[in-house]
Curated annotation (Swiss-Prot):
Transmembrane segments: none annotated. The lineage of its organism: Bacteria, Pseudomonadati, Pseudomonadota, Alphaproteobacteria, Hyphomicrobiales. One of the primary rRNA binding proteins, it binds directly to 16S rRNA where it helps nucleate assembly of the platform of the 30S subunit by binding and bridging several RNA helices of the 16S rRNA. Forms an intersubunit bridge (bridge B4) with the 23S rRNA of the 50S subunit in the ribosome. Part of the 30S ribosomal subunit. Forms a bridge to the 50S subunit in the 70S ribosome, contacting the 23S rRNA. One of its GO terms (cellular component) is cytosolic small ribosomal subunit. Residues 1-24 are annotated as: Disordered. This is Small ribosomal subunit protein uS15. SMART domains: Ribosomal_S15 (SM01387). It comes from Rhodopseudomonas palustris (strain BisB5). Residues 1-10 have a biased composition (Basic and acidic residues).
């Protein structure tokens, strides 16, 4: 359900604005998107796992808040994020 340290490092490297960037909204959205995809796959086999489903909803809410922040600051970055991570809006 969680992502490995190696996979997380790959996601960070692929979305960082500069070297050592781990806290920008783009990186945070990328990490959350990766975790959401993993949890979604988990629910295909564990349909009654409501405890984890609540965690998924919290992740989606956090990602939504970050996306709203990026949209408020820079519309072009927001659209690029949606397209890069296949997020429906």
């Amino acid at each position: 359900m969680s992502i490995t340290a190696e996979r997380k490092a790959e996601v960070i490297q692929g979305n960082a604005n500069k070297a050592g960037d781990t806290g920008s909204p783009e990186v945070q959205v990328a990490i959350l998107s990766e975790r959401i995809v993993n949890l979604t796959a988990h629910f295909k086999t564990h349909t009654k796992d409501n405890h984890s489903r609540r965690g998924l909803l919290k992740l989606v809410s956090t990602r939504r808040s970050l996306l709203d922040y990026v949209k408020k600051k820079d519309e072009a970055r927001y659209k690029a994020l949606l397209e890069k991570h296949n997020i429906r809006r």
